[in-house]
């Protein structure tokens, strides 16, 4: 039977697995991000499709890291010469050369670190962004599904390029509850991906505190003094951190 209880059991199992099996990987990722930010770097988060929600979770939110910038397909319209119509096709993430266009529109510095999110880990924009980051000497953290990416018939995957891989635990196809006539319902990659993102933030914040330094964290804009606090921190980064989503 498929109902909310069935999904809740599946989701709880996926969360439990992430908290135990990926603990070391998330710790290593936290060390990479901490080292980058402490050196004046910015976390560059990139995802396409529903993986954008995980990149968004890492950027521009209350309790999140201020030096974190979301790269996205939207950038070629926001900051480049593409029209909104050009980016409406969800298959655009498979377009060769798209990652390079996004890269050229961003203010990426040598000390920056990348978190790239993709369940399949195989679409052209994702793999090319990882290649670009590695080629330019950046550390790359992947949040991906090892089960799904292993089934992709491609020459290179995100997991092959990343310095640290966090497995979101999603099954092949992402949806986790099998249907009687074939196929499955109810995805889990966003759930575990967002959790992995917040666990990563916690690791970074903890390292700042252990070093006796205030963590560069956003306050809610809907609290007294929040806007002023955030503006002071954002001023350090200028155009390197773009808060483009309303």
For the regions a language model picked out, list residue spans one by one.
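Internal, active-site/partner-interface "lid" segment
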Residues: 174-177, 195, 206-232
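SAM-dependent methyltransferases
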Residues: 226-246
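A short, well-structured juxtamembrane/interface segment
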Residues: 21-38
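Short, glycine-rich nucleotide/cofactor-binding loops
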Residues: 15-25, 114-123
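Glycine-rich phosphate-binding loops that contact phosphosugars or nucleotide phosphates
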Residues: 45-198, 202
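Generic N-terminal amphipathic, Lys/Arg-enriched alpha-helix
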Residues: 1-21
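Short active-site oxyanion
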Residues: 41-43
């Amino acid at each position: 039977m498929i109902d909310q209880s069935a999904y809740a059991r599946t989701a709880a199992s996926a969360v439990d697995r992430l908290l135990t099996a990926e603990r070391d990987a998330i710790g290593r990722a936290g060390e990479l991000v901490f080292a980058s930010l402490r050196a004046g770097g910015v976390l560059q988060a990139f995802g396409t499709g529903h993986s954008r929600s995980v990149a968004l979770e890492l950027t521009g939110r209350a309790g999140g890291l201020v030096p974190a910038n979301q790269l996205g397909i939207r950038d070629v319209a926001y900051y480049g010469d593409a029209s909104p119509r050009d980016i409406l096709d969800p298959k655009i993430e498979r377009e060769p050369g798209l990652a390079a266009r996004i890269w050229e529109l961003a203010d990426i510095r040598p000390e920056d670190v990348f978190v790239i999110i993709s369940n399949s880990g195989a679409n052209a924009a994702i793999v090319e962004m990882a290649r670009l980051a590695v080629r330019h000497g950046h550390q790359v953290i992947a949040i991906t599904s090892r089960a799904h990416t292993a089934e992709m018939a491609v020459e290179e995957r995100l997991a092959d390029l990343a310095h640290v891989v966090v497995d979101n635990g999603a099954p092949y196809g992402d949806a986790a509850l099998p249907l009687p006539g074939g196929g499955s319902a109810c995805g889990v990659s966003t759930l575990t991906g967002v959790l992995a993102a917040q666990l990563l933030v916690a690791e970074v914040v903890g390292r700042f505190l252990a070093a006796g330094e205030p963590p560069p964290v956003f306050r809610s804009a809907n609290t007294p003094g929040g806007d002023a606090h955030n503006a002071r921190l954002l001023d350090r980064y200028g155009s390197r951190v773009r808060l483009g989503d309303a």
